[in-house]
Each structure stands twice: as structure tokens, then as C-alpha cells.
Curated annotation (Swiss-Prot):
It comes from the Eukaryota. Residues 119-128 have a biased composition (Basic and acidic residues). GO terms for biological process: box C/D snoRNP assembly. PANTHER family: NOP PROTEIN CHAPERONE 1, SIMILAR TO DNA SEGMENT, CHR 10, WAYNE STATE UNIVERSITY 102,-EXPRESSED. This is Uncharacterized protein new4. Pfam families: NOPCHAP1. GO terms for molecular function: box C/D methylation guide snoRNP complex binding. Residues 119-146 are annotated as: Disordered. It comes from Schizosaccharomyces pombe (strain 972 / ATCC 24843) (Fission yeast).
Amino acid sequence: MDKQIPKFEITRSSLLDQCKSFLPELEKANQTLLEHPDSQQDVQNLSDESNYIEMDLALGVLEKQPENSISEDTESEIQANENQGTLEHLMNLYNSRDREKGNEVTLTDFLHEKLSRAAQADLEHEESASIDQDEMVAIETRKTKK
């Protein structure tokens, strides 16, 4: 008694084809950037004539606080925070903390520090992950040019 396995026809997705053609182009562009880090390309001032990909990033940062902590925001600060975007609110909180130290932090520095901390936390949770301490120090101490 032979049981035949039913065969299903799978159609190719046009999205899959687009991804397969786009990813090698992206890899080639990344390799070019790695080979020429000081290239003439200014990503902040692109003309309308050149093609580029713009990616929007949404990042949320929550810091765990004790339940018995009292919010230091006054009513006016809360109202002001509602009128600005989430990223601006986070930057203001971050800069208000660092103003006491006399530092003004750029958005790039802010994101770099938060992403580095998140990556470090992920590495600490993975028991099998191993990273060279010199690499970690280099990641933490690297500053972007302003």
C-alpha cells in the first residue's frame, strides 16, 4: 500500500526576487565603504540627482526605576514633553543628566552609548558569547567626530 505524499506548487514571490537582487548591491556598497572610509560621499548633504536609501530608526530607552521613586517632572515639564517627539524627550533627559557634568551630547553619541549598552547586556545574557576585552574597550571609548 503506497501512500503518495501530496505535492504543492509553490509560486515565487516577487518580493523574494527583489531582495535577492538588492542584498548583493547592499553588500557591495558596504564593502566599498569599508575599503574607503574617508570617501568623498557626504551622507548629510545628498543632492537630488544621486540615489540613496533613507532608513528611519525608532529607538526607545527605558530605565528601570524603583517603584517607590518619585517623578521629578513638574507639570510644565510633562506638558512640554508631550509636545515633542520621543527621541527629543530622551535626548533632553539624557542631556539634563550630563549638563551637571558640563557635557553636551550629540544624537550620534547618545545612540552609540545606548546601543553599546544594549549590546553589552545581550552579550552578558548569552553564556556562550565571548568577546575580547580590548574590543569592548574600543567600542566603549570610540567617539564620533562632531
